[in-house]
Amino acid sequence: MKWLCSVGVAVSLALQPALAEDLFGNHPLTPEARDAFVTELLKKMTVDEKIGQLRLISVGPDNPKEAIREMIKDGQVGAIFNTVTRQDIRKMQDQVMDLSRLKIPLFFAYDVVHGQRTVFPISLGLASSFNLDAVKTVGRVSAYEAADDGLNMTWAPMVDVSRDPRWGRGSEGFGEDTYLTSTMGKTMVEAMQGKSPADRYSVMTSVKHFAAYGAVEGGKEYNTVDMSPQRLFSDYMPPYKAGLDAGSGAVMVALNSLNGTPATSDSWLLKDVLRDQWGFKGITVSDHGAIKELIKHGTASDPEDAVRVALKSGINMSMSDEYYSKYLPGLVKSGKVTMAELDDATRHVLNVKYDMGLFNDPYSHLGPKDSDPADTNAESRLHRKEARDVARESLVLLKNRLDTLPLKKSGTIAVVGPLADSKRDVMGSWSAAGVADQSVTVLTGIKSAVGENAKVVYAKGANVTNDKDIVTFLNQYEEAVKVDPRTPKEMIDEAVNAAKQSDVVVAVVGEAQGMAHEASSRTDITIPQSQRDLIAALKATGKPLVLVLMNGRPLALVKEDQQADAILETWFAGTEGGNAIADVLFGDYNPSGKLPMSFPRSVGQIPVYYSHLNTGRPYNADKPNKYTSRYFDEANGPLYPFGYGLSYTTFKVSDVKMSAPTLKRDGKVTASVEVTNTGKREGATVIQMYVQDVTASMSRPVKQLRGFEKVTLKPGETKTISFPIDVDALKFWNQQMKYDAEPGKFNVFIGVDSARVNKGEFELL
């Protein structure tokens, strides 16, 4: 792959603007050398220069490039985000080198969440792969392309555990499970940062949003979070720590309050936990405008007080507001903020710049000027093969009645739906520098797959939504939803006519990407009514109906599950989404994705997640009882459980075999199963291992994921899959907030999803 190739570009500092002779050189990238270097640099800096390093400025209408260059010249800026071309980045770094007193380099950051120019599946889709090699591919390609654009840092990965699909930002994360999110977040950090964020094609990561942003009440964006310390540390904190233990150089602090205190002013969170308990040495960055928002939170009385509270609480860099530059000089002069506190924040910023290699070469991610691409969006800069490979693994087959799929590449195929030919929507939210015109739609992918062997007829069929208020909301800043001026009846009639002349109907339905984004919380997680009407009309034709879902959250699909012959969950699959979806629809690739979030039957079930507590009156479907934990108007469990996903073949999992009946605290026990492909074609599935602490000092979840492995088998082939279990897999935060495992019986569940499992057991001595 080209992103693995060594380019061998050595940038001579002699070719760049004049540098401070004692600042730049071949500095060893070690903590000891860094600390000594930064200590000496701090001695040379004025108060204003120190404060300038704490400012993270966004390029945009409020801060045009020309105005920012003046700030840079005066040493008022430490870093820039939302500039994504080498040419623009080079000009800004030139300003530092040419005009600023100390020539301390800027770093440049962007939201590279699931790709930079090549857009991969959204993170929720990537989690569906249950494949860490796929995560590594996304991380390395994303870092390569970001660094090739001159960027030094990404605001990723997002590791907020979310169990509420009403929340729009769940699309950015890895789902409901702590273990899966931790594992994927850790892998993404390692892939993006490589051996060092100073490497030419690596970038520094910023784990976000610290902390528990995915648990906002009611799934409502920016809302409050309130939970016990046991739940916080058991379920929500581990993914952040996993990313930091993997070496992430930065943490983005959440916008929400946690147990009554905004994260931006929470010294317990940012100092006691992050710095003292976890030993984090990197930078903390406020989220967009969060310091200003402390006033509305009610924990600061005015702008000056907000700055004082934020800095003293542990916020190093201020994102996209002018408060630090306006109010810190006076606070330092008055002694309300000490010089030691200012130096500490500045030191953290200088440390990460050192770790990025910027004091060795401020242009390290830019290369020589004559190497800048003539066309920033050139096709040659994309990594389409990798995008297609990963996208195929992210797709989840939810239903396949009477083997409706795979389709034949013959006859007539109707492709309908408002998302079938949407280049923008297939990329999903937070698509970085991706260009919509370079993405492949489902319609294009199907046409390419069948060539001249089949006839494809297309009809839009419906708008994403006919609710004018929702359209206005979604289109407030960009045209996220395009509205067809035809009447709903005209559009449905066209789709029905297309269906009647076809052998099978593929309806591409769900959400516009803007509906699963920041500030896109929903109270109704069904498919919009305009599309439900379309589906009903298509069902009435009697033709086989395949639903291809595009969405950034679990949807309530009870009616659609009854109507459709097959359902394929594709999330937002990225640049090569259309081709990947066609690969699965026609059987060129056997689907193997699994759900990283449970799909509720209705919004009233939320939160519904697999690792719940048993309660004192658990519901037993085999022996229903009124006085148990249940709903009387809806089934208890989800429509599709966590870890669920079908294949075009079938698998049999044997009984669980334990290597020993007991486990010593310093030992291991192994749980094994034999997995057989009992179908007629090669396929892959994800074998999942869950653990349950049967009796403990606190009520424990009915099961918790503690291992998974994707296995590919030929027809009739059998493989043994083994999972080692040690005491760390059994630990939890008890009532005294001690992290420990308690002796006693443990159940082990292994299967192809969280519901279909076989059981083993052992005892911890």
Task: Report the location of each language-model feature.
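Gram-negative bacterial Sec-dependent N-terminal signal peptides
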Residues: 1-19
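Short glycine/proline-enriched turn or capping motifs at secondary-structure junctions
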Residues: 3, 755-758
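Glycoside hydrolase catalytic-domain context in secreted enzymes
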Residues: 20-734, 740-754, 761, 765
